[in-house]
Amino acid sequence: MHKIAEVEIQNDILIANKKLAKRNQRLLDKAGVFAIDFLGAVGSGKTTLIEKLIERMDYSIGVIAGDIISKFDAERIKRHKIPVVGLNTGKECHLDAHLVEHGLEDLPLDKIDLLFIENVGNLICPVDFDLGSHMRIVIISATEGDDTVQKHPLIFKEADLVIINKIDLADAVGADVDKMVDDASKINPHVKVIKTSLKDDKGIDDVIEAILEAI
């Protein structure tokens, strides 16, 4: 009986979140803002990717940076002199539409073309929680192991773009990057997969091109 009640509560939470996500997207559409949700594990390169995009893209960009406790990533991104809102999720391992709604209230949407939402570092929790973004980018690193895609199929099934980062370290950790690409393509045949080494700027232009195609 308790399990049934728990499932019903979870379903209610997801339904309510979906409604809020749609409201967020309507607000973004009205303001002419294209929003991207960046998902990936801790250390995959989400913040580095966002910084590279800020430096290279000729757009007015704002950022919502989610984290469980600290606002380290938000402070790091603020160095680029753009609007940034840091959101703490407390014990939750993902952002949700309600938190993002509050984040949007603190951003000058009339002065932003692109909104980057950096989700909490996790490959499982964020999957079911739509934020109202127009695009989902999943970034993983070769150092996480070449079975990472197989272990987390749902997040790749929902991705609009997949990035495999730190390919320069693949040999050192014994990771087969081509296998990771193949696994992602099998789970989501329509998704584009880009290999990057962000510390060397390798692949960043391909990422920008993919984003521009989606806008």
Roles of regions detected by a PLM:
Residues 67, 165, 197:
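Active-site glycine-centered loops adjacent to acidic/histidine catalytic or metal-binding residues
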Residues 70-74, 148-152, 176-183:
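Short, glycine/polar-rich helix-capping loops at beta-to-alpha or helix-loop-helix junctions
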Residues 132-135, 157-160, 188-191:
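Short glycine-/polar-rich loops that comprise or flank the Walker A/P-loop
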Residues 4-39, 44, 53-134, 145-147, ...:
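Nucleotide-state-sensitive switch-loop elements of NTP-binding domains
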Residues 169-215:
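Canonical P-loop GTPase G-domain recognition
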Residues 1-23, 169, 199, 203, ...:
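Iron-sulfur (Fe-S) cluster-binding modules
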Residues 49:
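Hydrophobic positions on the alpha1 helix immediately C-terminal to the Walker A/P-loop
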Residues 134-143, 160-165:
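Conserved phosphate-donor/acceptor-positioning beta-strand/loop module used by diverse small-molecule
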